């Protein structure tokens, strides 16, 4: 499909074409086959079953990539850095790395895509889509930051606490992302005052946010629109992190 952003028409008309195209594409996507495959591979997580049902996996993977493509196009309307991001650079292999795990089942039971202008291995904040029966979510943030980068982000939060609070405590953001971070220090990180009024924002071991969703979210015909709206509310958080990381680098 032609990328509407490269069609030489006026900006407003171009955006309208993208929206109409995405709505049509979303209607034609077979999202249920993604859930069918994931449920079946979860119940039959072995190579014999997988090899016998490779066609089902390929269909599920193709539909997930179609979904990601539509989401990328919609995100591009409010985040220009995402324009030109390719689906192949956002997805992950279905095969688990079992070398250091007691769980030797060979296949993942979810499909995920990380939409990031700098690549899925970047420290920068991106947009994550996760489909797993009973554990679907949308998420974003910066994961596993190197210690010096993490310290720089904490310093930016400390120095610009009013701006940061204005982002993460905004009702439009908080309705989808009520908590920042997943793992936390027990006390203030080294170099920051323990009595800082908003020390909870400095205790984060990673600056991430999660929006859990029922399976029905992705099965709904408007899931691309709703996903884009949720990520749009996340963008100021992403901008804060990415500006800080850019400045540090």
Which residues does each predicted region cover?
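Ala/Thr-enriched low-complexity intrinsically disordered regions
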Residues: 2-4, 27
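Short, positively charged and aromatic/hydrophobic N-terminal segments
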Residues: 8-25
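Long, solvent-exposed, polar/charged low-complexity segments
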Residues: 28-47, 64-72, 158, 167-170, ...
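Active-site acidic/histidine clusters and adjacent loop/turn architecture
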Residues: 39-92
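Hydrophobic/aromatic-rich structural module bridging two neighboring secondary-structure elements via a short loop
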Residues: 78-122
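Short, structured patches in soluble enzyme cores that scaffold and shape functional sites
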Residues: 117, 142, 211-213
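Compact, glycine/acidic-enriched structural inserts
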Residues: 133-186
């Amino acid at each position: 499909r032609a990328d509407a952003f490269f069609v030489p028409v006026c900006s407003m008309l171009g955006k309208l074409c993208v929206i109409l195209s995405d709505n049509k594409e979303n209607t034609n996507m077979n999202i249920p086959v993604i859930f069918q495959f994931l449920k079946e591979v979860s119940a039959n997580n072995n190579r014999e079953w997988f090899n016998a049902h490779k066609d089902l996996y390929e269909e599920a993977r193709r539909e997930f990539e179609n979904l990601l493509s539509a989401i990328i196009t919609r995100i591009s309307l409010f985040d220009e850095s995402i324009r030109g991001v390719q689906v192949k650079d956002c997805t992950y292999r279905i095969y688990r790395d079992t070398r250091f795990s007691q769980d030797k089942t060979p296949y993942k039971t979810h499909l995920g895509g990380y939409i990031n202008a700098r690549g899925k291995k970047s420290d920068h904040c991106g947009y994550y889509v996760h489909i797993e029966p009973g554990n679907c979510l949308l998420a974003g943030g910066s994961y596993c930051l190197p210690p010096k980068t993490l310290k720089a982000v904490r310093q930016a939060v400390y120095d610009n606490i009013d701006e940061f609070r204005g982002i993460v405590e905004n009702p439009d953001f908080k309705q989808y992302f009520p908590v920042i971070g997943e793992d936390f220090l027990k006390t203030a990180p080294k170099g920051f005052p323990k009595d800082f009024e908003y020390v909870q924002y400095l205790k984060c071991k990673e600056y991430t946010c999660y929006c859990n969703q029922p399976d029905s979210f992705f099965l709904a015909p408007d899931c691309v629109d709703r996903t884009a709206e949720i990520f749009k509310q996340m963008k100021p958080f992403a901008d804060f992190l990415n500006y800080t990381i850019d400045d540090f680098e």
